[in-house]
């Protein structure tokens, strides 16, 4: 039996709400390793970003290495949800200030999105 088969199918939501850049690097590494362990065909991953975590998407505009990691994860169908409440409260124009965030990535509430995904069977991970 392959290592990937032993884990079965998984649905996971990663929660990011800190502006600590090392946390983002670690979280991206965790997600990459998670996909590698389970197999891309066996996993659905969403990353919900709200509060101070949104500041990390500003950092990405300046860090090509992290940009490539985000791009790689998106190419593996990892979905990113960015909190509209946070964008409004911090007066952030996601089209200008955040790396690779599109209208479809915006969720009304990060916390409500986390709860919804857990109700849909996603396991919660807070790196």
Please state what every model-predicted region is.
Residues 1-127:
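Secreted/extracellular ectodomain signature
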């Amino acid at each position: 039996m392959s290592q990937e088969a032993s884990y079965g199918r998984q649905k996971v939501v990663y929660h990011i709400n800190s502006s600590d850049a090392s946390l983002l690097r670690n979280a991206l590494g965790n997600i990459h390793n998670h996909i590698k362990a389970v197999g891309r065909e066996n996993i659905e991953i969403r990353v919900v970003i709200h509060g101070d975590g949104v500041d990390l998407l500003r950092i990405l505009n300046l860090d090509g290495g992290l940009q490539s990691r985000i791009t790689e994860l998106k190419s593996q169908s990892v979905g990113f949800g960015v909190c509209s409440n946070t964008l409004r409260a911090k007066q952030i124009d996601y089209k200008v200030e955040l790396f690779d965030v599109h209208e479809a990535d915006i969720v009304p509430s990060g916390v409500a999105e986390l709860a919804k995904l857990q109700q849909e069977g996603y396991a919660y991970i807070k790196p």
